[in-house]
Amino acid sequence: MVQIVISSTGAEGLAEWVLMELQGEIEARYSTGLAGNLLGDLHYTTEGIPVLIVGHHILYGKTIHLEKPFAVLVKHTPGKQDCDEPGRGTGTQYLVTALIKNKILFKTRPKPIITNVPKKV
């Protein structure tokens, strides 16, 4: 199971992320890995069905509201310069940067996108 995060702006001032869940494995074309690279294009049909196009494949999914949302936390450990400030504790702090309330589930196998193939005469 592969999980990918999409970010957007939420109403509470926090970023609202959407979790994408794919069945199977995604491999990069080159050995550089997937981090920071474009995976594909996410579109919605007029009926609101999410469609993910990855290379020459298309996946249809559905949006699911999570019962218990996830919070994205950033750990902040005070360094030496932070300890010099008066009134600051020396403990580790966690900052909530985003909320994940929905996920897009792609549970079917990808279908190949076939263009017009010229026939040899």
Curated annotation (Swiss-Prot):
Q: Which domain of life is it from?
A: Eukaryota
GO MF, one example: DNA binding
Q: Which GO terms describe its biological process?
A: DNA replication; mitotic sister chromatid cohesion; positive regulation of DNA-directed DNA polymerase activity
The intrachain disulfides are none
Query: Which InterPro entries is this protein grouped with?
Result: Ctf8 (IPR018607)
Membrane-spanning ranges: none
Q: What is this protein called?
A: Chromosome transmission fidelity protein 8 homolog
Q: What does this protein do?
A: Chromosome cohesion factor involved in sister chromatid cohesion and fidelity of chromosome transmission. Component of one of the cell nuclear antigen loader complexes, CTF18-replication factor C (CTF18-RFC), which consists of CTF18, CTF8, DSCC1, RFC2, RFC3, RFC4 and RFC5. The CTF18-RFC complex binds to single-stranded and primed DNAs and has weak ATPase activity that is stimulated the presence of primed DNA, replication protein A (RPA) and proliferating cell nuclear antigen (PCNA). The CTF18-RFC complex catalyzes the ATP-dependent loading of PCNA onto primed and gapped DNA.
What are the GO cellular component annotations? Answer: Ctf18 RFC-like complex
In terms of one coarse class, where is the protein primarily found?
Answer: nucleus
Concerning its family, UniProt says: Belongs to the CTF8 family.
Q: How does it assemble?
A: Component of the CTF18-RFC complex, which consists of CTF18, CTF8, DSCC1, RFC2, RFC3, RFC4 and RFC5. The CTF18-RFC complex does not interact with the Rad9/Rad1/Hus1 complex. The CTF18-RFC complex interacts with POLH. CTF18/CTF8/DSCC1 associate with PCNA. CTF8 exists as a dimer with DSCC1.
Q: Which organism is it from?
A: Mus musculus
| Pfam families linked | Ctf8
Localization annotation:
Nucleus
